[in-house]
Design a protein with these regions (language model features):
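Residue-level signal for nonpolar/aromatic packing positions in well-ordered secondary structure
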Residues: 23-25, 32, 39, 56, ...
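Bacterial N-terminal signal peptides
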Residues: 4-16
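Hinge/capping helix and adjacent helix->loop/strand transition within the periplasmic-binding protein
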Residues: 73-79, 94-181, 242-275
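Beta->alpha turn/N-cap motifs
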Residues: 83-88, 149, 179, 196-201, ...
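C-terminal lobe and pocket-closing loops
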Residues: 115, 201-268, 300
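An extracytoplasmic/periplasmic, membrane-proximal ligand-sensing/linker region
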Residues: 20-22, 166, 253-314
Length: 314
């Protein structure tokens, strides 16, 4: 009874504090990008539920590192949140010498927001339509077997390493500064192939400007039902990209639970689901504990790959 009363009092105090000042959602990626779009959609839907203005605070750069550091330095009062992809929470601590944060000790998971597939696409001029043809072509043309990735040290880079090892193909990663320039070079034929979030390819695939030859997910995408997964084509790569919400460590549990509940209600709205699915994000609400477990599982999955690839901490 005492614990319940204390929780109720804290909840009332939090409600008063939130009504007086806005809640910030930090985003470490460019304005207008898919993660920024999701953040603004959630901010608009959650404000009434939380009884306060919710604003998106854009802190782009360094693969989300700048925004994550800003969260670490924020007060744990429930008014500063971070919308982050798996890259920031899993890969940065594995590939950067001093990321400035440790996900499981500096942050409090609030809940998963979405899952989304990846894809491997080839230029329109590439004479391939599936993985078997792509790897045969790569072996016959090793100097051209370059695969664009959105950033050095990103999940796509180590995904390409894993794929090359399984196929025994001479694939080389070519890092870009984001998915947009990668896709532009793919459309222009400056690079033979590229891998990033599937949503960056869908429109161009539909328009015949490039070809997606494999989907990185456990099942086919309803937007590209004709394109098989890597698993269907015989390759054991089934990583699921995800997006989650975090608060600073030490944030009161009542605040975490309140934001998680508001997040869940927002993600359950048909209009929110439709708008997220339009940019190839599948709403996937979960508990704080489940999100923390995703970080642990992701670290266990990628750490040996990073080590085997001989990655030197930057």
């Amino acid at each position: 009874m005492t614990r319940s009363l204390a929780a109720l009092c804290l909840s009332l105090l939090l409600g008063t504090a939130w009504a007086q000042q806005p809640i910030r959602i930090l985003v470490g990626f460019p304005v207008g990008g898919t993660i920024d779009t999701v953040a603004r959609l959630l901010a608009d839907q959650m404000k009434d539920d939380l009884g306060a203005a919710v604003v998106v605070d854009s802190r782009p750069g360094a693969g989300g590192q700048i925004a994550a550091q800003a969260l670490r330095q924020s007060a744990p009062d429930g008014r500063t949140l971070l919308l982050s992809p798996d890259h920031t929470m899993v890969m940065l601590p594995l590939t950067v010498k001093a990321p400035g944060f440790q996900p499981l000790s500096d942050f409090a998971p609030v809940g998963q927001v979405a899952r989304y597939p990846g894809g491997l696409a080839v230029s329109k001029a590439a004479p391939v339509s599936n993985l078997a043809e792509f790897f045969a072509w790569a072996k016959a043309n090793p100097a051209q077997a370059n695969v664009g990735i959105p950033a050095p040290g990103s999940i796509p880079q180590f995904f390409v390493f894993t794929l090359a090892r399984q196929a025994k193909a001479p694939l080389s990663s070519v890092p870009y500064r984001g998915s947009a320039p990668l896709v532009q070079d793919l459309l222009g034929g400056q690079i033979a192939a590229g891998t990033t979030a599937l949503g960056d390819f869908v429109e161009h695939h539909a328009g015949g400007k490039l070809r997606v030859i494999a989907v990185l997910d456990q099942r086919r995408s309803p937007l590209l039902p004709e394109v098989p997964t890597f698993l269907e084509q015989g390759y054991k790569v089934d990583w699921e990209y995800w997006l989650g919400m975090f608060a600073p460590a030490g944030t009161p549990q009542a605040a975490i639970e309140r934001v998680n509940a508001a997040l869940g209600r927002a993600l359950a709205r048909p209009d929110v689901r439709e708008r997220m699915q339009r940019i190839v994000f599948e709403p996937a609400h979960g508990t704080p504990a489940a999100l923390g477990e995703k970080i642990r599982q992701g670290t266990a999955y990628w750490e040996p790959v990073v080590r085997e690839a001989g990655w030197v901490l930057q």
